[in-house]
């Protein structure tokens, strides 16, 4: 009995620490949304991370309702659902119409359609411990997909030998969070809570190791300038997509200026070759007037 009480005590300690760290992670976008509220525009930010976070918190909250003695798992995911709903509501209020429509489609497809399908199937087709196992398996699968997202960043760091796109503080926080929730899952002997955090800890530790290795490196000595830019292409493309709805006039004006310069060079080349420049009569009449 003493061993059982000790395990519950450790589960409470790790669960409480996990709640505190996860609260901080959930609140980290507050400055971003304060700026959105103040400027009344989303400035090209995307809603995908918040829609995914809401779906993840909803799944884990549903899993927690099927288990006993996991109150701290309920509290953090209930808070996650609450705060992510606020973020998404603010995004919908200030986003341009295309981004707003995309967000609504994702919410209907993933958060409403996907979750309702899981809820109905699990409630009517399976019962008892089997239901908790199936929901836990779904949560693990989704969490593994979310944890695998930083792999593209890790690839970029290795290829460019630059940690520009991998903040150390965020990697450290997420690694500590994964360790705490891993210990919480082990204390509860819950493989569905523990397993995805093993992967989260491994990826977080790898990111910190890469940060130490490449901290003072800017670019790879084995990569040319074009290859470095190619390695950064996903981030650059994302930035271009985000800025496309806000600053489209600038690229257009640049293209026009480039066309003017090209036309000017063509005219000079024609004059040097002794050919009559195109639009010569129009230019003369304009000069005469």
From Swiss-Prot:
Induction record: Slightly induced by the pathogenic bacteria P.syringae pv. tomato, the powdery mildew fungus G.cichoracearum, and the fungal pathogen B.cinerea.
Domain (MtN3/slv) ranges: 12-98, 134-218
Entry comment describing in which tissues the protein is expressed: Expressed in leaves, especially in phloem. Expressed in developing seeds.
The UniProt record lists the keyword Repeat: yes
GO molecular function, one term: sugar transmembrane transporter activity
InterPro entries referenced in this protein's UniProt entry, alphabetically: SWEET, SWEET_rpt
Record-listed Phosphothreonine modification sites: 276
Cytoplasmic side: 31-43, 92-105, 155-167, 214-289
Pfam families: MtN3_slv
Bilayer topology: Multi-pass membrane protein
Keywords for the protein's UniProt record, in alphabetical order: Cell membrane, Developmental protein, Membrane, Phosphoprotein, Repeat, Sugar transport, Transmembrane, Transmembrane helix, Transport
Knockout consequences: Under high-light conditions, plants lacking both SWEET11 and SWEET12 are defective in phloem loading and display slower growth, mild chlorosis, and high levels of starch and sugar accumulation in leaves. In plants lacking SWEET11, SWEET12 and SWEET15, severe seed defects, which include retarded embryo development, reduced seed weight, and reduced starch and lipid content, causing a wrinkled seed phenotype. Altered sucrose efflux involved in the transfer of sugars from seed coat to embryos thus leading to starch accumulation in the seed coat but not in the embryo.
Gene3D superfamilies, per the entry: 1.20.1280.290
Subcellular location as annotated: Cell membrane
Membrane side Extracellular: residue ranges: 1-9, 65-70, 127-133, 189-192
Region called Disordered, residue ranges: 266-289
TM segment ranges: 10-30, 44-64, 71-91, 106-126, 134-154, 168-188, 193-213
Single GO cellular component term: plasma membrane
Alphabetical GO biological process terms: embryo development ending in seed dormancy; protein homooligomerization; seed maturation; sucrose transport
Key word Flavoprotein present: no
Family from the record: Belongs to the SWEET sugar transporter family.
UniProt function note: Mediates both low-affinity uptake and efflux of sugar across the plasma membrane. Involved in phloem loading by mediating export from parenchyma cells feeding H(+)-coupled import into the sieve element/companion cell complex, thus contributing to the sucrose migration from sites of synthesis in the mesophyll to the phloem. Contributes to seed filling by triggering sucrose efflux involved in the transfer of sugars from seed coat to embryos.
PANTHER family, per the entry: BIDIRECTIONAL SUGAR TRANSPORTER SWEET11, RAG1-ACTIVATING PROTEIN 1
Complex and partners: Forms homooligomers and heterooligomers with SWEET1, SWEET3, SWEET5, SWEET6, SWEET7, SWEET8, SWEET9, SWEET12, SWEET13, SWEET15 and SWEET17.
Protein's name in the database: Bidirectional sugar transporter SWEET11
Lineage: Eukaryota, Viridiplantae, Streptophyta, Embryophyta, Tracheophyta
Gene: SWEET11
